[in-house]
From Swiss-Prot:
It comes from the Bacteria. InterPro entries: YpzI-like. It holds the Pfam family YpzI. It comes from Bacillus subtilis (strain 168). This is Uncharacterized protein YpzI. Residues 1-45 are annotated as: Disordered. Residues 1-26 have a biased composition (Basic and acidic residues).
Length: 45
């Protein structure tokens, strides 16, 4: 587990997005569930 996480962190650090990657997955989760309700698209436009 530690090795796997270390590997991932090295990858993220290399692309310069360690913390933002976690935020993005959270946003993606919310975006998809909101889009299914059709509210996200309405709010965006």
């Amino acid at each position: 587990m530690i090795m796997g996480k270390d590997r991932q962190e090295k990858k993220l650090k290399a692309s310069g997005r360690v913390e933002s990657d976690r935020d993005q997955s959270i946003h993606y989760d919310g975006a998809t569930s909101l889009e299914q309700n059709g509210r996200f698209k309405k709010r965006k436009s």
